[in-house]
C-alpha cells in the first residue's frame, strides 16, 4: 500500500513483483482497483509473465488498464469452488481472454504448482479453455446487488 487511509481493507494488501532471471511474477493478493491504479500512477514497471489475479478475480480489481499494463502470458485466479460472491467475474475473465493470457483457476483445477528455471514457466495442470470458465454475467450482477444493498456493479 502507498497510503495509510484506504476505504477498503483489501487495498492494504501487499503487492509483490518477483523477478527470477528472465521470468517475472506479480502477486496482487486481495488488492482492488484503487490499489491497482495507485501502482500504475507510481510509474512502477508492472509487466509480468504471470499475474496472480487480484481479489479472486472480482470485478472490483484487475481493471482493464491494469491487466493491459501487466500483459501477462499466464493468469492464476485463486478462488473457492462455487464462490458465493460469483468470483471470478466475467468482466475479469474477458479482460484476460482479450490479451491472450493462459488461465489457471483453483476452483476448476485444484492446487496449481508453478515452476520456473528463469527461462521457462511450467505448470502442473493444463490451462483452461475460456468458454468453459465463463459464468453468466447476470448471475454475477444479481449476487453483487444482493450483497451490496441493491447497488449495481457499476455504482
Where are these regions (language model features)?
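Core dinuclear metal-dependent hydrolase active-site scaffold
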Residues: 1-50, 108-155
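Cap/insert and terminal regions of metallo-dependent hydrolase folds
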Residues: 38-111
Amino acid at each position: 500500500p502507498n497510503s495509510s487511509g484506504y476505504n477498503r481493507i483489501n487495498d492494504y494488501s501487499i503487492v509483490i513483483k518477483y523477478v527470477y532471471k528472465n521470468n517475472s511474477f506479480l502477486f496482487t493478493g486481495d488488492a482492488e482497483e484503487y490499489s491497482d491504479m495507485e501502482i500504475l500512477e507510481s510509474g512502477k514497471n508492472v509487466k509480468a509473465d504471470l499475474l496472480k489475479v487480484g481479489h479472486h478475480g472480482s470485478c472490483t480489481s484487475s481493471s482493464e488498464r491494469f491487466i493491459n499494463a501487466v500483459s501477462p502470458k499466464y493468469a492464476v485466479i485463486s478462488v473457492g469452488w462455487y464462490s458465493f460472491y460469483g468470483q471470478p467475474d466475467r468482466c475479469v475473465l474477458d479482460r484476460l481472454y482479450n490479451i491472450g493470457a493462459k488461465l489457471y483457476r483453483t476452483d476448476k483445477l485444484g492446487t496449481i504448482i508453478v515452476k520456473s528455471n528463469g527461462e521457462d514457466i511450467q505448470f502442473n495442470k493444463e490451462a483452461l479453455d475460456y468458454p468453459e470458465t465463463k459464468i453468466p454475467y447476470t448471475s454475477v450482477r444479481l449476487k453483487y446487488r444482493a450483497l451490496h444493498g441493491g447497488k449495481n456493479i457499476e455504482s
